[in-house]
Amino acid sequence: MKKLRLLCIPPYEGMYNLMTNIAAQRSDVELIIHMGNLEDGLRAVLENRDNNIDAVISRGGTAETIRAHCSDIPACDIIPSVYDVLRTIRLAQSMSDKLAVVGFPSITKPADMLRDIMQYDFKVRTIRSGAECEACLRQLRDEGIQVIAGDMISVTCAQKLGMNGLLIVSGIESV
């Protein structure tokens, strides 16, 4: 039986390590792993296009970027579980009651659901591109938000703006 060849593009080191461990345990799948975020992930797909890749696995904005530019290769999105989001929100709440979740839809949908179910008081902002992120975070900072929970682009941008950024990490169940 032919091995399935998957190009995995984790946006952060912890997910890279998790994918490497999963790859070591699977004999039916060949995982090619390149760490990257947004355009870096797209570049990895373009560089590996001739390597007979069956599908791409990534998260959030990186998966969306790949789908938008490479319609000939299926791109699967790792969606954080509600528990992944809850874990980060609880940590953020211990830092400040002025917090927001910012990210691509795969991050903000579970956050919205969690906010409604648990009746938590935090803002949720969905972005569609890296370019939108800074303006969104500046507005939240002007509204008094101190802590941002989100994806790689949101956390990196928040830290550049002097805000606290907490990455919502995906557990092994999500990956």
Identify the function of each model-found stretch.
Residues 1-175:
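Non-catalytic structural scaffold of enzyme domains
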